[in-house]
Curated annotation (Swiss-Prot):
Post-translational modification: Some glutamate residues at the C-terminus are polyglycylated, resulting in polyglycine chains on the gamma-carboxyl group. Glycylation is mainly limited to tubulin incorporated into axonemes (cilia and flagella) whereas glutamylation is prevalent in neuronal cells, centrioles, axonemes, and the mitotic spindle. Both modifications can coexist on the same protein on adjacent residues, and lowering polyglycylation levels increases polyglutamylation, and reciprocally. The precise function of polyglycylation is still unclear.
Record EC number: 3.6.5.-
SMART domains named among the record's database cross-references: Tubulin (SM00864), Tubulin_C (SM00865)
Entry domain remark: The MREC motif may be critical for tubulin autoregulation.
Species annotation: Xenopus laevis (African clawed frog)
Superkingdom of the source species: Eukaryota
Enzyme type, top EC level: hydrolase
Active site positions, chain numbering: 254
Protein name listed in UniProt: Tubulin alpha chain
GO molecular function: GTP binding; hydrolase activity; metal ion binding; structural constituent of cytoskeleton
Binding site for GTP: 11, 71, 140, 144-145, 179, 206, 228
Length: 449
């Protein structure tokens, strides 16, 4: 089997984890106690779900996941919640005191006390796998645990499991909706540390998701539950190909091969369609062409940036539900002719397509309508550099005055790490700029040296 281990770090990671595993269980017909009714009609005898669940002798299905937080309250909710019997108690790991939005606490002081325990749990999960293909790490950029502990964990995973792919789902600090003042510091420190260890990172911007909830689902004040359920649909679409048999199947390494042209340029933009409330869906057709077009609307993206200002390097469309290749090809052909989609000149306009016949599942009582087909587009575009630029600007404003830096230094960091991280981010922005430049321009520059 091609197993994946999910690691959920910090409050954001754990809460997204709750939403994701709730959805996986519904999709595979697994009850909250881990039992799967024996009639097997739901999965149709398809055992691909074993990539995400391991089965015990008693027929209980246990998620291949670890939940880690440096303070107990969030994971305690899992321990007492609906799905408390689903997880092995050892998979829920908590510390005593939290990282207090401080990268240095998550990475150095408090993180190092718990890291060996976490790695031991991960090793136990890895031992149960016959052919582990990689890790999915869920975390936020802004929090102390999400930024600091994740970067520590990624470094250690690279040492212990060097060849395995590591994919991240990272919550990018929203431009307007901020939960901590020091988010720009944490984000840039964690990006710098994790850059060389992560193979592919899907960023999710809370504000973009807020707007989608407000605009498409008519939720006036979206809660984190609303956001997480939407995020879990996207994660589910990305991982569906690993969990179900489909016509065109995609595995973890295949994503990287198709989306990451250079090791550092590994931040694809995710777009999901249709996000629509039940009363609207009733009156709309939502054909393959409709949902494919919707993917190219900046309004449906998970990060606020404008791909019309950037260039595409790669594009991957993952359909699920009632979709036939003929419709997909027609939809893509139309888009290629009329859209203002610019590909970089060194990459011919290739769209990679995955089709999965399992229709999207919705959480009962949730906000999304039950639809026959959905699509998730992953595109590697230079426009995402806008997101980095925004973050770097905020970092600069604070760091120019050395605001809040003493909290980090007090936990054993050196000020040099800040400037080093900031330089790395500047280099990343420059990388994106160069990748988007036409290859002809680049050659002229070369002659001057």
């Amino acid at each position: 089997m091609r197993e994946c281990i999910s690691i959920h770090v910090g409050q954001a990671g754990v809460q997204i984890g709750n939403a994701c595993w709730e959805l996986y269980c519904l999709e595979h017909g697994i009850q909250p106690d881990g039992q799967m009714p024996s009639d097997k009609t739901i999965g149709g005898g398809d055992d691909s779900f074993n990539t995400f669940f391991s089965e015990t002798g008693a027929g209980k299905h246990v998620p291949r996941a670890v939940f880690v937080d440096l303070e107990p309250t969030v994971i305690d909710e899992v321990r007492t919640g609906t799905y408390r019997q689903l997880f092995h108690p050892e998979q829920l790991i908590t510390g005593k005191e939290d990282a207090a939005n401080n990268y240095a606490r998550g990475h150095y002081t408090i993180g190092k006390e718990i890291i060996d325990l976490v790695l031991d749990r991960i090793r136990k999960l890895a031992d149960q796998c016959t052919g582990l293909q990689g890790f999915l790490v869920f975390h936020s950029f802004g929090g102390g645990t999400g930024s600091g502990f994740t970067s520590l964990l990624m470094e250690r995973l690279s040492v212990d499991y060097g060849k395995k792919s590591k994919l991240e789902f990272a919550i990018y600090p929203a431009p307007q909706v901020s939960t901590a003042v020091v988010e720009p510091y944490n984000s840039i420190l964690t990006t710098h540390t994790t850059l060389e260890h992560s193979d592919c990172a899907f960023m999710v911007d809370n504000e973009a998701i807020y707007d989608i909830c407000r605009r498409n689902l008519d939720i006036e004040r979206p809660t984190y539950t609303n956001l997480n359920r939407l995020i879990s649909q996207i994660v589910s679409s990305i991982t569906a190909s690993l969990r179900f048999d489909g016509a065109l199947n995609v595995d973890l390494t295949e994503f990287q091969t198709n989306l990451v042209p250079y090791p550092r340029i590994h931040f694809p933009l995710a777009t999901y369609a249709p996000v629509i409330s039940a009363e609207k869906a009733y009156h709309e057709q939502l054909t393959v062409a409709d949902i494919t077009n919707a993917c190219f609307e900046p309004a449906n993206q998970m990060v606020k940036c404008d791909p019309r200002h950037g260039k595409y390097m790669a594009c991957c469309l993952l359909y699920r539900g009632d979709v036939v290749p003929k419709d997909v090809n027609a939809a893509i052909a139309t888009i290629k002719t009329k859209r203002s989609i610019q590909f970089v000149d060194w990459c011919p306009t290739g769209f990679k397509v995955g089709i999965n016949y399992q229709p999207p599942t919705v959480v009962p009582g949730g906000d999304l309508a039950k639809v026959q087909r959905a699509v998730c587009m992953l595109s590697n575009t230079t426009a995402i550099a806008e997101a980095w630029a925004r973050l770097d600007h905020k970092f600069d404003l604070m760091y120019a005055k050395r605001a809040f830096v003493h909290w980090y230094v007090g936990e054993g960091m050196e000020e040099g790490e800040f400037s080093e991280a900031r330089e790395d981010m500047a280099a990343l922005e420059k990388d994106y700029e160069e990748v988007g430049a036409d290859s002809a321009d680049a050659e002229d520059e070369g002659e001057e040296y």
